[in-house]
Amino acid sequence: MRRREFMAGVAASLAALRERAEAMTASTRPNIKWCVSSFLWTSTQWPDKGTLPYTEMLDVIRDTGFNGYRFTGWPGILDRIGMDLSQLERELSKRNIQIATLSFGGPADDPSKHAEIEKAAREASQFLKRFRATELVTFSPRRPNKVLVREHLRRACEFYNRLGDVCAEYGIRTGMHNHSQGQLVETQDEIEMLLKWTDPEKFHWCPDTVHLYMANCDIIGLFQKYADRLIFFDLVDAKYEYQKEELRLANGQVEKAGSQNGTFMLGNRDYGDGEIDLQGIMRILKNVKYRGWINIDHHYARVSPRHSFD
């Protein structure tokens, strides 16, 4: 499939996803903004090297009606987008879209790395402030053996309170993005420990529903209990599907049958086709009067995405 055809397919898929998602919210909810993650491009469409067709992605985001996107690959990808920050500002302004946040992380469970992570957080916060974003999505480090998770999480939480203070100096809030593929904060008990051990005034919650699903969490229960900690989240429907066959991606990469990454990607479903109570989540948001971004972080676009929406 040629790149132009693939981009058209992705655009059709994203537009339909946005329409389905917006249908779950009342038209009178101006406090919610919708974004998409650039991870869809960086993970499955673009090669690992060379200058990226970045403005093509921006066009798709504009044409499909999103308000903005989550910037992924920071800071290394800045050298590959084919423009400086001033030009990026112009390209965003021309399309009337925003950078909603960026993905951030580091070995927060290693005290010897804290100064380095803090420096990176200051740079990330400066970047976000320049683009008038107000949230930083933090990913946890790689997970150790389960026996050691509690201690590593304790160390990380001590740092995350400090990280919240650092970001606040720039008018930025930060919070945890749970991840089900080998990171420190995956399961329900780990999420709840993190939210218990961090200061709610300093460190918040940026969950991802597909990762909550893959970790077998009580998604509705978590949203009910911690809705007041939400500052940003990824809304993705999901249904488990083991990858039985080789999966060839648009960027030429191949996921061998039985891979965890391929199985995870196949588990991403169009809204209403999975097993997550999306309406229940939206009711909770309404009850707490949630204000902020909802990210449609569809991690995988199938070869013919249009067929599932017609």
Locations of regions flagged by a protein language model:
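Active-site acidic/histidine proton-transfer and metal-coordination neighborhood
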Residues: 10-17, 28, 91-94, 98, ...
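Active-site mouth loops of central-metabolism enzymes
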Residues: 39-52, 107-117, 149-151
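Active-site beta-loop-alpha junctions enriched in small/polar residues
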Residues: 39-41, 72-76, 104-107, 141-143, ...
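Soluble or luminal CAZymes and related metallo-dependent hydrolases
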Residues: 53, 84, 116, 120, ...
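Aromatic/hydrophobic pocket-lining residues that form π-stacking "cages" and hydrophobic walls in ligand
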Residues: 57, 88, 124, 163, ...
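Conserved beta-strand positions in the central sheet of alpha/beta enzyme cores
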Residues: 70, 101, 137, 175, ...
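Glycine-rich, proline-tolerant flexible connector loops at the mouths of alpha/beta enzymes
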Residues: 70-89, 143
